[in-house]
Amino acid sequence: MDKTLSRNEAKELMQLLGLDMTCWGNLPLMRTKYLSKCKEFHPDKGGNEEKMKKLNSLYLKLQECVSTVHQLNEEEDEVWSSSQVECTELCCNFPPRKYRLVGEVYGDVFEEYILKDWDICLKGFYYLCNCFYCFLDKRHKQKYKIFRKPPMWIECYCYRCYREWFGFEISAETFFYWKKIIFLTTMQGVGLTR
């Protein structure tokens, strides 16, 4: 999300939303807080008009930039085949799948698909694995080869981009929060469908 807002703008937006910077990039949470803060800051409700204007301008700028990044990702869809990651559950057959959250599509079997083996997948030893972690990591490498620049968080939803963007180490805790973001993001946003 380095192409969305400057660091100072991002900090200001997160401060207005009442969120810690560790939540930067968790778009579903940010949206929920934005709607809540709109009610709180609205001048007709006795709120602060200046804060409301600043919140709106920063949030709308973020939305426009994220939309642009997602459009660029859609143009890159030819890099992979949707058959590389598939759900055989009945729930996956109902359209429009690409606009549904990953958690809605995979439901109870999400945990089975997110990571096959912690030790093997995180070290990159199992190149035939099609768990979400390995698939998104392979996609990260493909994007790097094609565009000759490393993709960043939101351009790429892999665990590596998540950790690099937020400055986290590999740990069960950071993995837990990454998979929660994947769970609450659309199939199209993550890049798991066309």
From Swiss-Prot:
Keywords: Acetylation, Activator, Early protein, Host cytoplasm, Host nucleus, Host-virus interaction, Metal-binding, Oncogene, Phosphoprotein, Transcription, Transcription regulation, Zinc, Zinc-finger. GO terms for molecular function: zinc ion binding. The modification N-acetylmethionine is found at residue 1. Residues 12-80 form the J domain. It is found in: Host cytoplasm; Host nucleus. A zinc finger (C4-type) spans 121-134. InterPro entries: DnaJ_domain, J_dom_sf, Papo_T_antigen, Papo_T_antigensf. Gene3D superfamilies: DnaJ domain, Small t-antigen, unique domain. A zinc finger (H1C3-type) spans 140-161. Promotes efficient viral genome replication by accelerating both G1 and S phase progression of the cell cycle. Inhibits host PP2A by binding to the A subunit, thereby displacing lower affinity regulatory B subunit. Inactivation of PP2A in turn results in the transactivation of cyclin A and cyclin D1 promoters. Late during the infection cycle, ST may induce dephosphorylation of host MTOR, leading to the inhibition of cap-dependent translation. May establish and maintain high levels of viral genomes during persistent infection in cell culture. Interacts with host PPP2R1A; the interaction inhibits PP2A activity. The common region of ST and LT proteins comprises the J domain. This domain is essential for multiple viral activities, including virion assembly, viral DNA replication, transformation and transcriptional activation. This domain is also required for cyclin A-transactivating activity of ST. This is Small t antigen.
